[in-house]
């Protein structure tokens, strides 16, 4: 089994990559390491997994987990992502990468469309063209908007997002559903 994790320097991605690597699962992590969250924290997480970014390499093999490889990559870089999909045989893609932040999305909507919609489309296309059987992705509770029904339910209506961020995550849900129906 070989798993691709996007957003692997983020909080959830780091813990997931580490857990899979510890289990002996071939794990390939990518992350843009953008500055929305503290870059030094992301680098510290990678270092804790045995990834030394100071070596200035294209791919980094973990010194702690020989089955874990990391590459700095933005999902918006379609040629690089296409090359990655063509060079590896992934059984599962776990997409945790996203430009987060509700307030920031109101000031920088294009950043969210690029990362969360176009980037996710590149993931969907990679899975489709390379016949990857499983895609798991993280949505957000933001898709429920101003719903007063708490706790949220998966079958609750989520048709009225109140931020660009929430709209992009709802878009991801609809895109994934459509790709699943069209392409299996």
Regions found by a protein language model. Give the residues of each.
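N-terminal Rossmann-like NAD(P)+-binding domain of SDR-like oxidoreductases, especially those catalyzing
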Residues: 1-184
């Amino acid at each position: 089994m070989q798993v691709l994790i996007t957003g692997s320097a983020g909080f959830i991605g780091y813990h997931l990559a580490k857990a899979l690597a510890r289990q002996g699962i071939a794990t390939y992590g990518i992350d843009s390491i953008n500055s929305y969250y503290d870059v030094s924290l992301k680098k510290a997480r990678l270092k804790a997994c045995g990834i030394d970014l100071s070596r200035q390499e294209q791919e980094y093999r973990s010194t702690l987990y020989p089955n874990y490889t990391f590459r700095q990559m933005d999902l918006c870089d379609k040629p690089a992502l296409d090359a990655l999909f063509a060079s590896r045989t992934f059984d599962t893609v776990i997409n945790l990468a996203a430009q987060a932040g509700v307030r920031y999305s109101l000031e920088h909507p294009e950043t969210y469309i690029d990362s969360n919609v176009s980037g996710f489309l590149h993931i969907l296309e990679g899975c489709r063209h390379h016949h990857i059987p499983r895609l798991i992705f993280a949505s957000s509770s933001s898709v429920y908007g101003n719903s007063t029904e708490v706790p949220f339910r998966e079958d609750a209506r989520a048709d009225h997002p109140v931020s660009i961020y929430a709209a992009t995550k709802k878009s991801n849900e609809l895109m994934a559903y459509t790709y699943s129906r069209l392409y299996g």
